[in-house]
Amino acid sequence: MIKINQLKLPVGHSQKDLEDKIRKTLRIPSKETFHYEVMRRSLDARKKPSLFYVYCIYVTIRQENSIVKKLHQPSVSLVTETGYRFSEMGQERLNRRPVIVGAGPCGLFAAWQLTLAGYAPLILERGKQVEDRSADVERFWKTGILQPDSNVQFGEGGAGTFSDGKLNTVVKDPSGRNRYVLETFVKFGAPSDILYDAKPHIGTDILAKVIKNMRDYLIKHGAEFRFQTCLKDIQIKENALQALVTEDDTVIPADVAILALGHSARDTFMMLHQHQLPMEAKNFAVGFRVEHPQQMIDDAMYGNGKRNALRLPAAPYKVTSNFPNGRGVYSFCMCPGGYVVNASSMKEKTCVNGMSYSGRSGKNANSAIIVSVSPADYGAQDPLDGMHFQETLEHKTYQLGNGKIPQQLFGDYRQNIASQGYGDFNSQTKGQTCFANLRGLMTEDMEHSFLLGMEHFSNIIPQFDRSDAILSGMETRTSSPVRIMRDTNGESRVHGIYPGGEGAGYAGGIMSAAMDGLRLADDVMKRYHPVY
């Protein structure tokens, strides 16, 4: 197979244009047939208003060695496609089926691999299945009535279900897990373009259907799900897991448990800490959701009027900066054509997130603009101090908005006065809102960094710091505030406990969490033989 890198064509090109470009690049005679697959497509807007798609293409043709040798071009090479493969099973026999705690991306993909390999896992999920969960979330947004275990953070699919649904990751992936996850999503209903888009996106509406289809398949092939089943305790003997205890005091004997908890399972973090599972505080970031008109972002990223003229998707952006005080300020979970959502999961605590549907057709762009937080900011004497710092910010936000999302125009934030109304555009939110003064939620040093960041980003995206940009508070759940320690085999200090995913501090989004779930399943398989 031949790999062509950096094959560039103008946006708006035809399929024939692409085929002709491949033929020209490889000097394939007009009568010679070939097959090709697009492996990656990215948008190059560095020379706007001229926009280009840049491709990575795999080509199958006769005499591949000869073609590559004659061309002698760095962008053309021979490759052997190798997909993700499960490890061979270990020799130790499991006396009981493995248990997975959490049905987010990490838990679902651990369940996927173990189910296909014949381990028939049991999946415990504190929230509801995605259909019922979606109804609870919509009800919360309309009424403010919160279900503590069925909300934007908890339930089948995990926190990423109500987000932008990004499927990109910076995790290095020589094993092929990345593409395997994408292929699995496509198998259960995701659009096939996620396989090659440089910034793949699935959207809340499609992701919910994919999750349901995946669950149905797993059940049909031997997995068991128990929803509304919260882990309350673990039983340990001689430093080995003996059983899991659920909220209703059901005892589930277990030799192996994959803990795919999610970044908001604070009660479970505390329970594990009481059992002295080694964990450490880690860096995270907090800030505000910031909304701009999507057209403003489109024009900045593509050139004036280019989005409609070339039928391009709503433009994303990514901005970052570092300042002399040691803090980083950057965008996080940017949602083109999206909504700001109330993402709370605890009583009297408010936090926000961003969410997009698959079409990204909303009028506003939003992103978290967040400020880095280190253990030095909250005097970490205990591994859970970062978690308590988050809770303090969320409680202050709840009090400020009386349970609603508190909002403020950036110009008013800069002047330290409460807003009275919107400017040239309105907010797009899921959840009740009110105007307030968001100053004082963060420390003065963090506020100063946030202001510097907004001003700096206006040098990259014109009018980014416009006075009527809408801030919503607070974004606190950017990542887990703790890391549950594990060894190179994925196991914690307690034999049989495998912590993973975003909650354990080993992932940062749908893809990396799913890949970590596969890795943990692989770790279990390499050691144990399934119960038959």
What are these regions (language model features)?
Residues K3-Y53, Y58-F162, K166-Y532:
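Residues forming the flavin
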